[in-house]
Amino acid sequence: MADHQTTKIDKSNHLLLDQTLLRLPYDLMRKNFRNAHFVVEHESKAITKLLKDTATGSLKGKHSSDDVLKNIDAMLAKAKGIKRKLQACSDEEARLYRQLGARIKHVGEVVSMETVDDVRYEQWSRTRLDRLIVDYMLRHGYNESACALADDRGIRDLVDIDTFIHMSRIQESLANRSVTEALAWCHENKKELRKIDSNFEFMLRFQQYIELVRSQTLPKVLEAITHARKYLIPFKETYPHEVNQAAGLLAYPPEQTSDSYSNLWGQERWEMLSTLFIETHHRLLSLPSFPLLHIALSSGLSALKTPACHTAGARDLADTPNSAPGNSLDSSMCPICSAELNELAENVPYAHHSKSHVEHDLVLLPNDRVYGKARLEEYARKSGLPHNCVKDLRTGEIYPASRMKKVFIT
């Protein structure tokens, strides 16, 4: 029977990995509520003001009946606009509640289990793996494949497809040298960006200024100066270096090479803005900066990694993944020594084992495989072999028991 401590589920680690699974819908619901509140506050003030002006003008005879009807039509249009916007907020809230309910149920399933031997754990683990793969694909721009996988596995409520698709759309617009969608996103999250002291909007405005100056035409240069006065100069205390560079760009056109300004004219700045957007987006939504799959994989690799996994023999094994299965080292089942994971696991720490689970009666077979003697004898007995023969548990090779050699761990 397996050691209970080795099969017991560490629920705290599971919950630690799935923090964003529950936090993101909650944060999005708060944002959705603020949007609905803003719509009601802003639009109701406009309707109230128009109603008051209409009533006052009508009583004083300043408005004709046609003017009053036009104002009433305008108020009705605004009211319909409020209803439409609130309906969108209501639909979004219902979607987020559905997501949150599905995620609470998903996390609750593992909380109700005690060991990995539970028959439900394998299915739960497969669902979690599908979630991590979808998250990885969304972060790397494979949106259609991620959606197809989520729909096929029925886990759409457990992954943040809409959030990452919106992010990738803005990222793509920056790659196409447009800041329009990114600025709209900054406007939607103005208060939150101010709280985290983000410089993303300033860098977008700075890039707008650079593109205006790049044209080197008088109207565009004058527009750039106006743009700088409105969006850059007010931040001269916060970003003095960038503001000084903006002023210097007027004296150093693109065709003149200068170490201080050549990097500002380079198109790689758009890649920098794209990277900065992703960092800001993840920070704003409390998302990990790298895929959750990497976290889970690194933990698993570390738990299995030993110093022998990156010896010369292990590297030779990783370089020859198609070797014949009859060879002892080439048929190793160690995932760290495999060609796919050997390089990935090189920088993760070694496993920390406070308790040994190595069999006490290890013996070496002629094919250089090591097993516990009791296991070999039991397997031979179940296989109907003579009492003086043993059978390799993996390859099925049969050897005389006299050819086994005792193994001592040093």
Swiss-Prot record:
Keywords: Cytoplasm, Metal-binding, Nucleus, Zinc, Zinc-finger. It is found in: Cytoplasm; Nucleus. GO terms for cellular component: cytoplasm; cytosol; GID complex; nucleus. GO terms for molecular function: ubiquitin protein ligase activity; zinc ion binding. The keyword Transmembrane helix does not apply. Residues 163-220 form the CTLH domain. It comes from Pyricularia oryzae (strain 70-15 / ATCC MYA-4617 / FGSC 8958). Belongs to the FYV10 family. Residues 125-157 form the LisH domain. GO terms for biological process: negative regulation of gluconeogenesis; proteasome-mediated ubiquitin-dependent protein catabolic process. A zinc finger (RING-Gid-type) spans 334-395. This is Protein FYV10. SMART domains: CRA, CTLH. Involved in the proteasome-dependent degradation of fructose-1,6-bisphosphatase. Pfam families: CTLH. The keyword Nucleotide-binding does not apply. Its main location: cytoplasm.
